[in-house]
């Protein structure tokens, strides 16, 4: 479900997703709430945008510090996910590259197609950003733009915008050095290049080559300005993971930024129960399944044994940084900002649901059950768990129905509820704060009777598919689901996730039976 109320009035990127979680469209916004809301408020969309809105079932977003950062991040996310509606909705001209040709004296140009010799950089989502980088590189390194080498110097040479290889004012070797530097910038290695150029400038000054040193100084200044515009695409030698979290109501809300060669390419969020060594347990589990980065940026010092574990998995030392200031601290703060906005917008959903159902406490842990079958065969049950308003997929469960023959949703629901909570009682694990059944009065009654037999007192409701009504034990009339009401949208979101999970398991079992 798409909860517009959770969106902040801040810059960032938004990702529309389908019911399977596949990214349909990536966009950037100066104000996330206003931009995304406009999709659902306007009625005069073009056919392609209308199709996008109809197909969208989920929404994710990443908050950035500035609109420029959002612009750069949008480019990265589109190149990563290649969403089909971006290709349909955005002008294809915006996907042009910067091209350095393979000629003796390479020229720089904007290329619509990646054909021909030389090197291509991009594509760039933003024409504005692409043109800015193009101009900085062209002017800084005085590269030629002419299609054919003229026999005499053009105006660009006379105003200092071109080094004039056409009239022999620069050697092939010197021009080649400029092209090397331009290539380095376009690949994102600005920091390394500036460092190298500063050393060269000092050498020239020491040799009293003041004119050349001043030219290098001007180039460095232009590159430093370009670098400042790319906080979200910091180009470094190594990959980084940036991790931050908030602990609230015995629950950990954790955000992980994945930075590849300086480019923020992914955001992963996790919600799980608080434990004394939660951070160590999370890092051990996560990096047992994922390759550790060369640098891990965290808000607190890690135990030496954990640092050694990361080195063992990586095969070499992993740098662990706890920044107190500077650019890395800004990224750590940005991760925290995304935790606060991304997760605690979810708290409003929980409060709304608590109010609607008159629950004794905030429904921090919610479990929802669904039954799926195909003509009486491959009947399966699914259970999804939401913690802190987000799916906690680690605690999803599947049930192959064992005691029921044919189609009997009431008996099937009774079986999965009995099996789930008998096991929790046996293992002495925590009970959820709310149970949701996908179905009507009959399914609710079956589940409620099983809870009574087990002497479990947990609030339980059901949601009927067709009528979209909520049934509560003891109430004669169902509670209506109101359009755009936060609590109602949240219950529908949980129900839809349980249904999706059940259908997935059903398909898996059917495929296995066909193979047999």
Curated annotation (Swiss-Prot):
The gene is uvrC. Residues 9-87 form the GIY-YIG domain. The UvrABC repair system catalyzes the recognition and processing of DNA lesions. UvrC both incises the 5' and 3' sides of the lesion. The N-terminal half is responsible for the 3' incision and the C-terminal half is responsible for the 5' incision. GO terms for molecular function: DNA binding; excinuclease ABC activity. Interacts with UvrB in an incision complex. Belongs to the UvrC family. HAMAP family: UvrC. GO terms for biological process: DNA damage response; nucleotide-excision repair; SOS response. SUPFAM superfamilies: C-terminal UvrC-binding domain of UvrB (SSF46600), GIY-YIG endonuclease (SSF82771). Signal peptide: none annotated. Pfam families: GIY-YIG, UVR, UvrC_RNaseH, UvrC_RNaseH_dom. It is found in: Cytoplasm. This is UvrABC system protein C. Residues 191-226 form the UVR domain. Keywords: Cytoplasm, DNA damage, DNA excision, DNA repair, Excision nuclease, SOS response. Its main location: cytoplasm. GO terms for cellular component: cytoplasm; excinuclease repair complex. NCBIfam families: uvrC (TIGR00194). PROSITE patterns: GIY_YIG (PS50164), UVR (PS50151), UVRC (PS50165).
């Amino acid at each position: 479900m798409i909860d517009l109320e959770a969106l902040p009035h801040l810059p960032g990127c938004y990702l529309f997703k389908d019911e399977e979680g596949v990214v349909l469209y990536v966009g950037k916004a100066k104000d996330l709430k206003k931009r995304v809301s406009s999709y659902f408020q306007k009625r005069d969309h073009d056919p392609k945008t209308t199709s996008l809105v109809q197909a969208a079932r989920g929404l994710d977003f990443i908050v950035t510090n500035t609109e420029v950062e959002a612009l750069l991040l949008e480019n990265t996310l589109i190149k990563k996910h290649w969403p089909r509606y971006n290709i349909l909705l955005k002008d294809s001209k915006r996907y042009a590259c910067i091209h350095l040709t393979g000629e003796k004296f390479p020229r720089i140009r904007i290329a619509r197609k990646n054909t021909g010799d030389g090197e291509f950089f991009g594509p760039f989502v933003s024409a504005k950003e692409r043109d800015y980088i193009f101009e900085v590189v062209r002017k800084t390194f005085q590269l030629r733009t002419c299609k054919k080498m003229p026999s005499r110097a053009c105006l660009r040479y006379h105003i200092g915008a071109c080094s004039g290889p056409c009239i022999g004012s620069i050697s092939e070797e010197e021009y080649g050095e400029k092209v090397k530097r331009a290539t380095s910038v376009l690949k994102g290695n600005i920091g390394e290049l500036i460092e190298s150029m500063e050393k060269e400038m000092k050498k020239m000054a020491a040799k009293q080559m003041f004119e050349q040193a001043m030219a290098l100084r001007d180039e460095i200044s232009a590159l430093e300005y370009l670098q400042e515009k790319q906080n979200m695409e910091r180009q470094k030698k190594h990959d980084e993971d940036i991790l931050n979290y908030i602990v609230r109501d015995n629950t950990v809300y954790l955000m992980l930024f994945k930075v590849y060669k300086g480019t923020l390419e992914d955001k992963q969020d996790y919600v799980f129960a608080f434990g004394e060594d939660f951070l160590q347990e999370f890092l051990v589990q996560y990096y047992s399944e994922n390759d550790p980065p060369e640098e891990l940026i965290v808000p607190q010092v890690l135990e030496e044994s954990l640092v050694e574990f990361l080195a063992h998995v990586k095969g070499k030392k992993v740098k662990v940084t706890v920044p107190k200031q500077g650019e890395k601290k800004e990224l750590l703060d940005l991760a925290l900002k995304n935790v606060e906005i991304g997760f605690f917008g979810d708290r409003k959903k929980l409060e709304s649901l608590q109010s609607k159902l008159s629950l004794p406490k905030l429904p921090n842990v919610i479990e929802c059950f669904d039954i799926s079958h195909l003509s009486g065969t491959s009947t399966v049950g699914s259970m999804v768990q939401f913690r802190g308003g987000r799916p906690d997929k680690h605690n999803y469960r599947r049930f192959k129905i064992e005691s029921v023959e044919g189609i009997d949703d009431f008996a099937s629901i009774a079986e999965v509820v009995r099996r789930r909570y008998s096991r929790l009682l046996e293992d002495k694990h925590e009970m959820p704060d709310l149970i949701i059944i996908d179905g009507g009065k009959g399914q609710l009654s079956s589940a409620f009777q099983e809870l009574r037999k087990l002497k479990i007192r947990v609030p339980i409701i059901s949601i009927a598919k067709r009528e979209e009504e909520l049934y509560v034990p003891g109430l004669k009339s169902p509670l209506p689901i109101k359009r755009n009401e936060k609590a109602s949208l949240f219950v529908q979101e949980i129900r839809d996730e349980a249904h999706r999970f059940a259908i997935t398991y059903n398909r898996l079992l059917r495929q296995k039976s066909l193979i047999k």
